[in-house]
Amino acid sequence: MQPQSDKQSASRLATTTSHSTAAASATAATPPKVKVIKSKRPLCHFKFYLDICDHQLAKRIESDIKALGGHLEFFLSDDITHFVTDKPEVIGGTSGTPGTPSTPGTPTSHYQQNDGSARKPNQRQSRADAILSRVRRSTVGVVNSGNSTPTTSLKRSYTIWQTDYAQRFIKRIQTELKQYLEGKKEGGGGSTSASPHHIQLKKQYVKIESVKRNYRPYYHLIKQPDDWPKIDLSSEDGAFRLLTKSKTKDKEHSMTRKPLGSRTSQKDKQAAGEAKPLQHPSLQELKKQSAIPNSPRSNCREPIDSSEKQGGVCEICKLEYDILNIHLQSKDHELFAKNSDNFLALDTLIQSSADVNRFLEEEPVESELDMDVDESLSNEELQSPRQRPSPALREKSKRITKGKHSSEKFQGVAVASPQTPFPGAKKVQGNSPGSLSELQRQEHPTTAAATPTTNSGRRKTQNSGLSPPKRAMLPPSSIYKVVETREECATPPRGRGRPPNQVDSPSLIVKFQKIRQTELQRLNGEAENFMFPRTAVPTTRSSSELPTDVDRQTTSDVRGRYSISSASLDTSTSEAETKESSGLPTSIRKRAQAVGRRRKVGGAAAQDVFQRQLSTGSSSSNSNQQRFPSAPIQPEEGPQPQPKPQLKIKIKQEQLVATRKSSRTATAIVTAATASSHQQQQLRQTTCRKMANKLEDRMGELVKPKIKIKKEVIEEQKVKELEDLEEILDKELDEEVDSSCSSGSDEDYIAGSQRRITAAPRKSTDTREQRAARRLSRLTINRSAGELELTEVKTSPSKSRTKIQKPSSPTKNKVKQTKAVPPAIDLFFDCSKSERLREMQYTFESLPSGELWNRVFLRQDAGEENYYTYYGSTNYRKLPYEMGPIPMAKTLPAHSCALCREASEVKQDKGEQIKLEDQKPAPKKEVKKEEEVQSSSSSATYKNKKLHLLQRYQQEQEQLQQLEGNSLATAGAKCDSKASTPELLEREFASGSMGDRVQLIERVRSTSSSSCSNSQRSGITCRNKQLARIAELPPRKSPREHASTLALVSCIIRQRQDSQSKTNSEAEEPPPPVAAPKLKTPIKQEPVAPSSPRTTRSQAATPVEELRFATEISETVKRMRRGQNKYDHSPPAPVPTPATSSPVRSRRLTPAARNQSQIYSRRLEFATSQRESSASALLGKRKRRVNPSVAGTVRPTTQNLPGTGAYRGVRKLPSKKGLLEYEMETCALKALDQARQYCNPGFVAWQLDKYLELAGKEYDIEFDQISPEVESEGREERLVNTPQTPPPTDCFTSEFDLCDLIMGSAGSGDDDEDVSRGNPPGSGRRMSNLNLYASYYRKRKSLKSNRTGWPKAQRRRNAGGLGGSRALPDERINFQKMGLAELHPIKQEPMETEEEQTTTTTTTTTTSATRGNLLSKDDEDDEGGGNSPSGGSPADDKQNSREDAVMTPPATDVDEQAEPQADEMESLPDEDETMADSVDQQQDVEAEIEATDADVEEEEEEEDEDEDVFEDAYEEQDMGIQKTEPHEKRARIPSISVTTPPEDSSQGKKLLLTLHNGQRLQATSTPSTGQVQQHQRRTPQLNGSLGSCISPSEKLGDNSDIFTVSSDGLDTDLDLSNTQAGDSHEHCPHQTTPKRKFDISKYAPPNSGKAASSCAAEAATAAVKSLAISQFLKKETCASSSSMRNAWRRTQRRAISAACISAAPSARVPN
């Protein structure tokens, strides 16, 4: 029986069950089925009854049972599960008792029955014994008598165990429990294999785990060191076979599956040998699976002949094959593999990551010797790559795997590992000694370097592999390098071999983490220094590098030029080695370094080596920081970009110096290099030659070999591409450096750009390198032409500045070369350097410079990309990298984007200006910095965002000052600074004519797209946005899809996606007609070549911009969530140039001109409107007032058909959601060009003044007098047009920088909005400026933000497309004017809420007069901007309140709600008008209110269902109002806008009210009107209408603050709103407070007397608003809300209104 019990499953988990089952079968009563539990008390369910005579045994068993959690029963009852007895089982004794069979049934003797024991007594015992046994049974209660035994046995529910079996079972459970507790918890209280999920991974292992932890992690223990997976590039099996023990001869010969087969056998042996030590059955299963054909591991070790039997696709050739070996030997494959051009991408990747060459560069001295040897070896390997790599890799992998734990590494190749004693080692030894030493080298790169082996000519570190112990002792960085050392399996050694040396296979991960942190911290070479500090040779470099790091800008600059010599001295040996290695044929060295790289970069091998050395050198310099040269994902080596700057520096000093020891050195070099671009050019040429010999600088050495390799390879393969990219990258880096220096993070950027610069000179070492260096110097010269002066000047002021400027000068030079000097080699050179350096920089970040799309984006960022876009009806937009070859600078100028041309021109100008800027280098540098900052955003560096912004602002200030003297300089500064403050933006807009702005923008554009968008803000941004809208390029997805970029820009991308989705819906709608169509003389309508990448590109945020956006957006979002904005005031709206002066309008006025125009506008406004509230009259408001007049002027003129685009010639084509496609007619292009054309600021100012005097007054008068029909037409058209053109992207798109967002200038967004609103180019420009600011503020501040803080209003931009008419820039009602009269209405807080929502809902803005002033334009912007910017305006301004509403819908809702309540309560007399007017206005107001509410709700879009019904109902209503009052209102509103003060008169009030009402209703149609109406809404009118609605419908209770959407439904409320109109104006100023916060108190307090009550009511009703407004608006306000929604939605958002209304109130409530 015992044997049987033993036979039972090892885990007694089921033992009882089986026994009980057996018993059940034997016995009628089924024994209990109890299972062992996997826990510390496995027998917790067991209840034992012990019938044991032996006391000791009973005590022992009892203690064991208790220890295992079992229970002991002292009475034999049915509860017991097991009956343990020491009595012999009666097999036959139970004759006649059916229970006996149970014992046999359970062959286990434990089923001995009491009956059996009783029967025995019956048979042989005396009667006393029988009685005793019977008594025992009775005591147990199971057996009453021997005769009853059968029945008891039948009835018994327990299992009978013999004591011996019980002991065995207990012992088994104990052992299992011990294992379970020891970590074999998988085996949890039962079988060893019971819990394979908890395996203790020891030694080397690969673990694949899901981040979400939805799946059980997969792990693979690597018991044998050579089992460690290796990427054997030279194996026939493929690059990523799990190279196991049989990696030697078979692998050497074929590198196919035969070695795999042998590996399999070895692994089988291992499995057999390890079966005993196997920790878990799961491990055994894994081992077995490896032998199983279908198992994942079996794939790695396919049968030896599998390659012959199995067909497949060659991933290299992309060809299918039946037999792998035959295919590998085919000419096609060989030719393909030998063509290094086929592996450029891989080469780039490899070079950007840990690299053998880099490692060699890191250890130049050893590298020299080893490089020579390695080259011979590498040649041999090239001849027989499979043979050598396989043994080397196998041995290396073995040792690496063991290396961690065992001294096998130390012992040598022979000692594979305890587990694999010598199979791997013998194989390795069996292989060429080179392979063994190579493996050792790989394992211990440093040691290898120390002990050069003839076998390992490639890396000294590899050679040191001969003495594994030393290598093993080396720090992980060297190990990393060793892994990379692998020539043919550069990746496998990199990835696998080194980690074991580091003692951690996970060390790779750790390194990566370190790399990431460092890389993120220092995108430039510094990241490399930190990430890949070298301990051996690198120490010297690191020592030099450290000083460079410490003195980055000062010492670094000095070292960059001179101090690098210290680095050069350190590097001199390495450089000498590198040079010697370089001395070896670059191709040979390259081959030696990496077979894969060899293939790809045949001639570039030396360059790769040099690059690696450079990178390694940088790493070495960073030896204090861990470096992982062999890291598979090594950053391309910030040093590579650095080498270029270093070369420049060395140009000053020597290229040895120029070569950066480290990224820090590179930074210094960049500084130095920046100092003298021409010197750098010359030095590059000379230094490039010197570099070959004088890469003594650690960086220099590393950089130089890299440059050689890179340059050769890249020149040969990607010379054009890489150089082009390099130029762009250099440009970006330079810009980054400038901006970085400004920001305090310039060093990082500088480092990057310097690397590129340095790389170029070093490349010159080779003939190609020299050529590239010369070309680069040419580029540098070209760039320097404009930049050199700056660079030199800056250099003299400060080397750090020189750094910054030098990169910028290279940037400019490169840009110029891209444009003027298009030498392919130059481009290649730049690209190769910058590209790989950039790649290294971003390897762990976001910039995959090696990828085509990234190059395209870089080009785009630099404004050098030629967009071959098509404006067809197709919805598909090619990604930038899908658009074909990236045009070179040498491409026909026609193909060169305007930015490129402008950049070349601007560079020339800069050449001249640089001298000026030498005098005032800060502003110029600021401009460059801006450009660079934007470029560097891609670098994700804005470490010092605030510093950067400050600097930008300062730069802007300086440039603004310069702008008066030098419009171009100002423009550059403006572009770069991107109007840090609204005032700056206003200045920019007002200060420069459109032409000036355009030139500025063009210039900036050429410099950097983001910078361009900033400076363009007034002119070019408008055009770009228009063009972007016209031909909305899809956001560049590739870079954003890049993991690092995604991480950096994910928030931006999300926001842009939101805005785009909304924008797309709007995009589907025709772009809102700009004022230009209405203008008889469209100023901007001159055809602007949409080809200008800047124009097209402005929409997509550049990586730099995105980085900046990410930072600023996060800040802005936080602010928005708090209801704050960086600038908690409405963005100053630039004074719109009168529509009459079309050319002027399209240009920014000089500050003086703007001031004059503002004065004029102010006079006009005051003359026309007495209501103007000085409090509300901000500069922006005044500008807006001017704008309204301009808008008014243009509005009648600019009545685009509903379907017309932003410009007359621009038609939106049906497009897919997310894509805006426009057709541009010549007139539109002309208008755009005209807008961009430069105009003398003074002339523009004069024009503005004159226009304001003449046209403005006329319009002021006319607007008051203009028939409502005309205005309604303009409004309607605008309504139609505005919604059609959603802002191309989020308010955070590249169109406007976050700086602009922060500044509240709607930079590019505003321009786009201007265009979309269809303002005439001139007035559109002016108004666009205002709109841009307002919309920007809306976008930035007023954007209704979800709880998440992201603007929900973007939906409104989509849905607001219809409502966007309100945002029509043409009709920008100067809510200053309106707002002056109506800023007070606290009760219009609902309106204010609406204004914030009007940001969301343009009409809503009307609530706040102050905001309304801004919003009059902002609303236009919002609506005109397709409501995309609806939240753009800062919530602070009431003008911006609408705009603000978009960004912060909840706050806006609450604030607006509160405001309407306050306004209602206030019943400001200011806006009291005749009952007829009141009624009309109230209807309009109610419509507007509802529209606003709809806007708010639309933002929320919670009640989209109701929207359609309401919209339809309201649409009719609104249309009537719109057509009747809106014209009047519009006429008044424009006049109000232009001459808000005069219009503030009763007529103005009426107009305002009408505009308010009409705008509210027609806000969609006329943003200006909407704004005015909003102001009037703020006026008690709105409040009254709101209040009336609210009062009658107390369901809303305080929901009236929600501008009782029902107000529209309650037409009777008009009277109330009229009565309350005056107060709202009085309280408008308080409403200037950002609505975004939705702080009712925020708005209520300014509402003076009524502020408290309204605030209290609003606060009290805040919650009610959400509920009541949602419900009441839905119920009672269905009609009114629909009217409201229709009012602003009529065009754009009819579907959303109901939902938005419901949602908006709720949104308000939260705030």
UniProtKB/Swiss-Prot annotation:
PTM comment, free text: May be proteolytically cleaved to produce a N-terminal 50 kDa product.
GO MF annotations in UniProt: DNA binding; protein kinase activator activity; protein serine/threonine kinase activator activity; zinc ion binding
Cystine connections: none
Bias kind Basic and acidic residues: ranges: 549-560, 908-932, 1435-1445
Record-listed Phosphothreonine modification sites: T1081
Annotated region described as Sufficient for interaction with and activation of Cdc7, given as residue ranges: 1-400
Assigned GO CC terms: Dbf4-dependent protein kinase complex; H3 histone acetyltransferase complex
Residue intervals of every DBF4-type zinc finger in the record: 307-356
Record field: compositional bias (Basic residues): 588-601
Residue numbers spanned by region Disordered: 1-31, 87-129, 244-307, 365-507, 531-647, 733-771, 791-817, 908-945, 1005-1025, 1055-1157, 1271-1290, 1303-1329, 1343-1370, 1383-1644
Residue ranges with Polar residues bias: 429-439, 537-546, 793-812, 1092-1101, 1536-1545, 1556-1591
Miscellaneous comment: Named after the phenotype of mutant embryos that possess a thin fragile eggshell resembling the chiffon fabric.
Lineage, opening ranks: Eukaryota, Metazoa, Ecdysozoa, Arthropoda, Hexapoda
Keyword terms, alphabetized: Developmental protein, DNA replication, DNA-binding, Metal-binding, Nucleus, Phosphoprotein, Zinc, Zinc-finger
Name this protein carries in UniProt: Protein chiffon
